[in-house]
Amino acid sequence: MDIQWYQPTATSHSYEPFADLVMDEYSRLLPAPNRFPSSADGKGFAPLAEYVHSLGLKFGIHIMRGIPRQAVFMNAKIKDSKYTARQVAQYNNICYWNPDMYGTDTNCPGAADYYNSIFELYASWGVDFVKVDDICRNYNNEGEIKLIRNAIDNCGRDMVLSLSPGPARIEQAEFLKENANMWRITDDFWDKWELLYDMFTRAETWCNHAGAGHWPDCDMLPIGPINQDYSKDNRSAFTHDEQQTMMSLWCMVRSPLIIGGEMNGFDDFTMSLLTNEELLNIERDTHCAHMVTRKVVDGNEQIIWLAPAKDASVNYVALFNAGESVCDITVDIARLGIKPTNAYDIWNFTTEAVGDKLTATVNPHGVRLFKLL
């Protein structure tokens, strides 16, 4: 459930400053019943979460860090606390793009009481995933991240904690691994080649920090219909080659795969990006992925990544062409210290014998992705 589910008059992607939000007596935002009828009479998202769970899926919500400004103006109570919203709020700590919240004064015990109370509420609804926004790229938000982590740990329900937006700082890597499950390594990612090209550098920076329970997040996959009206004509501006490059890189880095398009409008090609089992095996079953080489050859930038399977049974190699023309890319397999006999082309579903070297013709902005057997 994305941003501002508590705002009854929301009609677009624009925010309405200082709108009347749906909130309980304890400063906790609630779903707007006019938009989510099942939430009426204090039920919150519990009925919707129950339905989602009945489908075999997990239920997640988006929240902004901090305490509602509306609660501060009202000096509302905080559940199980002697402190009020005004005592918890940090008035000079605000989000520059969303008007709903004040940051909290983490030196005030009431801030912990507030975060404990909202995650207690989310646990009662059956929430499995929480994306906390306006918290990841700010240098000074470690205190609130710790309060959120503690609140989740004490709420009685397992929840995935995702921090946004990026770019997160590599200097915070160990802190983020200890306190979050996902964190954005980039600002909002859209269907522009320059953003995808930049991701190669970000991926190299963060790849060593992906592991069980903690994942650098390259952001959503802008595939299929992605504009605000989700018209089938407003499809991703990425070429097919660029979309395969994106999927290959995200899986090599083992970034969370978050669909950013309207699924009802997906065509066969878009579905093929998400249902390629060998590709998804890279996401699930590899570790220690890393860039092998990055160099310019005859005017085309060539980037090679390697990802070994956790059980060392196979290796995956990605040959990326970041240039503007078709080129041949060669990887010296012998120098990688592995001895495969066959290479399975994951996007083209073909197998070829392989020796000490593997050469593939790669389209501009494209990739050839191989499973080495």
For the regions a protein language model found, what residue spans apply to each?
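Active-site-proximal beta-strand/loop segments in catalytic clefts of secreted hydrolases
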Residues: M1-Q4, H62-I67, V132-C136, L161-P167, ...
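Aromatic-lined carbohydrate-binding/catalytic grooves of carbohydrate-active enzymes
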Residues: M1-Y51, L55-A123, V127-D134, N138
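Glycan-recognition surfaces
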Residues: V88-N93, D105-N107, D113, N154, ...
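Extracytoplasmic, non-cytosolic globular domains
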Residues: L121-P167
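Carbohydrate-binding surface patches
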Residues: Q244, W250-V253, I258-G260, V297-G337, ...
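Catalytic cores of secreted or luminal carbohydrate-active enzymes
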Residues: T245-R294
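Solvent-exposed beta-hairpin/edge-strand motifs
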Residues: A334-F349
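C-terminal beta-strand-rich structural cap/linker in extracellular carbohydrate-active enzymes
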Residues: V354-L373
